A protein has these predicted regions:
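"Rare, low-scoring activations can occur
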Residues: 2-20, 71, 78-79, 97-181
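A glycine-biased structural micro-motif
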Residues: 91-92
Length: 181
């Protein structure tokens, strides 16, 4: 797959420390999505489509189970467990929206700020879905130092490699700081 090749190239660049994929950025709060609790009642939460590198690179803590490895595997946060009503282990359970199955839960991540510390904790599902992940096609890159020089290098490389595409780079630190200004 061409996207996997691009990822392999990015991860092999000497000025990139790490790379992961997702459909949105963690500081944007993910996409709003409804889920169904154990009584069949809908509630709103957040969803993101990630790869297996996302959780370790972004420093999310797995409290139970393991990280995603295969398509259709899901990580949920503590708040989603509470909202769904699962009081025993969620590992192996199906995350649902009415009759639609998002995937099988393989782990629980510690709650984290998914948009703003000024908002209540969101229910979050992180789904390993290759198809959905490529729809938005976001890359989270951690550059090695010196950051400015390496940012210039990756911008030049992308412009040369994809001359017809408008590939943009943003600093996660600046985006988070903007949330609190």
């Amino acid at each position: 797959d061409s996207m996997d090749k691009i990822d392999g190239i990015l991860r092999g660049l000497p000025f990139i420390e790490a790379s992961c994929n997702s459909a949105s950025f963690i500081y944007n709060g993910h996409t709003r999505q409804s889920f169904t609790d154990i009584n069949g009642k809908r509630f709103m939460g957040c969803i993101d489509f990630i790869d297996e590198h996302y959780v370790p690179i972004l420093g999310l803590q797995i409290l139970q189970g393991r990280n995603v490895h295969q398509d259709g595997e899901v990580l949920v946060n503590e708040e989603l467990l509470r909202q769904v009503g699962w009081t025993d282990s969620p590992i192996g359970r199906k995350l649902m929206e009415d009759n639609y199955e998002w995937g099988t839960v393989v782990g629980v991540v510690k709650d984290y700020v998914a948009q703003s510390a000024y908002q209540p904790q969101a229910s979050v599902a992180l789904v390993n879905s290759l198809e959905r992940r490529w729809e938005a096609n976001k890359r989270n890159l951690i550059l090695k130092e010196p950051f400015k020089e390496n940012l210039s290098r990756i911008r030049a490389l992308m412009k040369e490699t994809f001359p017809t595409e408008d590939i943009q780079f943003r600093s996660a630190r600046q985006e988070v700081d903007n949330l609190y200004q």
